[in-house]
């Protein structure tokens, strides 16, 4: 889940504007698309508000959109036109850093890997299962078929939480 140089640059510019709106920055997706790019910002309630079961509102998203639009006009880090979207990460949230996954140990995640794992004809570049543990270099996953994996964090291209209705 290595962030691109452009996403890192945008994060450094955008993070203070998001914080000024009293919400937390969950992550940023940037997709250049010819002469029009897409910038998607995910925000979530601050930890102390989450403890009170407060969620991101449409008003939070509108405030962040307004603040970030102004900052981007000043810094102009995106060539050409762009579409700005602001939303919560949702139930099936993407993880943008290894640290974000710690709070979801015991839950189901979906991983897209850089290099295949497994043996023989069971090799796979995608794995879905229960996140058993995570440390500084790897995570342990019990796949939905019961197979156990230890996966290097550096081998994860993309990770998402799988929402399961309780």
UniProtKB/Swiss-Prot annotation:
<dbReference type="InterPro" id="IPR036847">
    <property type="entry name" value="RimP_C_sf"/>
</dbReference>
<protein>
    <recommendedName>
        <fullName>Ribosome maturation factor RimP</fullName>
    </recommendedName>
</protein>
<comment type="function">
    <text>Required for maturation of 30S ribosomal subunits.</text>
</comment>
<dbReference type="InterPro" id="IPR028989">
    <property type="entry name" value="RimP_N"/>
</dbReference>
<dbReference type="Pfam" id="PF17384">
    <property type="entry name" value="DUF150_C"/>
</dbReference>
<dbReference type="InterPro" id="IPR028998">
    <property type="entry name" value="RimP_C"/>
</dbReference>
<comment type="similarity">
    <text>Belongs to the RimP family.</text>
</comment>
<keyword id="KW-0963">Cytoplasm</keyword>
<keyword id="KW-0690">Ribosome biogenesis</keyword>
<dbReference type="InterPro" id="IPR003728">
    <property type="entry name" value="Ribosome_maturation_RimP"/>
</dbReference>
<dbReference type="GO" id="GO:0006412">
    <property type="term" value="P:translation"/>
</dbReference>
<dbReference type="GO" id="GO:0005829">
    <property type="term" value="C:cytosol"/>
</dbReference>
<dbReference type="Pfam" id="PF02576">
    <property type="entry name" value="RimP_N"/>
</dbReference>
<dbReference type="GO" id="GO:0000028">
    <property type="term" value="P:ribosomal small subunit assembly"/>
</dbReference>
<dbReference type="InterPro" id="IPR035956">
    <property type="entry name" value="RimP_N_sf"/>
</dbReference>
């Amino acid at each position: 889940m290595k962030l691109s140089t452009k996403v890192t640059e945008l994060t450094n510019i955008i993070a203070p504007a998001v914080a000024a709106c009293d919400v937390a920055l969950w992550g940023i997706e940037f997709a250049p698309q010819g002469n029009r790019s897409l910038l998607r910002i995910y925000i979530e309630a601050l930890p102390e508000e989450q403890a009170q079961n407060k969620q991101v509102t449409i008003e939070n998203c509108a405030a962040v959109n307004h603040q970030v639009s102004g900052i981007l006009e000043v810094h102009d880090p995106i060539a050409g036109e762009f579409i700005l979207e602001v939303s919560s990460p949702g139930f099936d949230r993407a993880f943008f850093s290894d640290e974000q996954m710690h709070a979801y140990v015991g839950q189901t995640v979906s991983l897209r890997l850089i290099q295949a794992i497994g043996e023989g004809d069971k090799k796979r570049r995608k794995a879905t299962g229960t996140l058993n543990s995570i440390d500084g270099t790897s995570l342990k996953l019990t796949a939905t078929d019961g197979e156990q994996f230890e996966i290097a964090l550096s081998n994860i291209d993309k990770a998402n939480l799988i929402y399961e209705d309780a």
